[in-house]
Regions:
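Alpha-helical elements of Rossmann-like donor-binding domains used by nucleotide-donor carbohydrate transfer enzymes
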Residues: 10-14, 32, 46, 50, ...
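Asp-based, Mg2+/Mn2+-dependent phosphohydrolase catalytic module
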Residues: 99-187
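A short acidic, helix-capping loop that chelates divalent metal ions and anchors anionic groups
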Residues: 34-37, 102-104
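Active-site neighborhood of HAD-like aspartate-dependent phosphohydrolases
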Residues: 1-29, 163
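A metal-dependent, Asp-based hydrolase signature
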Residues: 35-65
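Short, acidic loop-to-helix structural element flanking the phosphoryl-transfer center
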Residues: 60-93, 131
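Short, surface-exposed acidic
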Residues: 19-29, 56-67, 186-187
């Protein structure tokens, strides 16, 4: 929700372009092991080494892969603009299926200082929709699920949160989302 479109789609397209390879070929290699990043088992260098093994002749330096990877983030400005508009009484937490280095950059970004809990899958070792991920978020927030609104763009994650007692709101389009927040008295 804080990024436009899908990061994975953008990184694989950008990488395919840099390698002059078909995007389908790059995506096959990327998606076969991206969970290793999401769960924090691998760093970017190990991930890139594995991709290179799957794509013989992919002669890109690790530093260039890292640059392409990190520059593929496209922020959803509307979500960042929304943060200061939320009342101070609304406590925020983030549960993100994320990657090493990206989570480090997010933690360093002052716009995230409003969040009481920042839970990243690569640091936790569990990702949405696993129950352990949601329980870590609740521990970070220090409140029961019944007092929390979980927002996500993936239905499977919303269903998992609802099963644990969270109220849920799906993020599809920003205006509809903010209307939903207004309806709930949060804006």
């Amino acid at each position: 929700m804080f990024t436009e479109g899908t990061f994975d789609g953008r990184i694989t397209a950008n990488l395919a372009s840099a390698l002059s390879r078909p995007v389908e070929e790059v995506r096959k290699a990327y998606f076969a092991k991206v969970e290793e990043l999401e769960l924090g088992r691998w760093g970017l260098d190990t991930f890139w080494e594995w991709i290179q093994q799957q794509l013989p002749g992919a002669g890109l330096a690790s530093s260039e892969f890292r640059r392409i990877f990190l520059s593929s983030v496209q922020e959803n400005a509307a979500m960042y603009d929304l943060l200061p508009r939320l009342p101070d009484s609304v406590e925020l937490g983030l549960l993100s299926n994320n990657y090493p280095e990206l989570s480090t950059l997010l933690r360093a970004d002052p716009r995230w200082s409003r969040f009481r809990a920042l839970i990243f899958s690569n640091e936790l070792g569990h990702k949405k929709p696993a129950e352990q991920a949601f329980l870590a978020l609740l521990r970070g927030l220090g409140c029961p699920a019944e007092h929390c609104l979980f927002v996500d763009d993936v239905l499977e994650n919303l269903e998992a949160a609802a099963a644990l007692g969270f109220q849920v709101l799906q993020y599809r389009e920003h205006q509809t989302f903010t209307a939903g927040l207004t309806e709930l008295g949060l804006l």
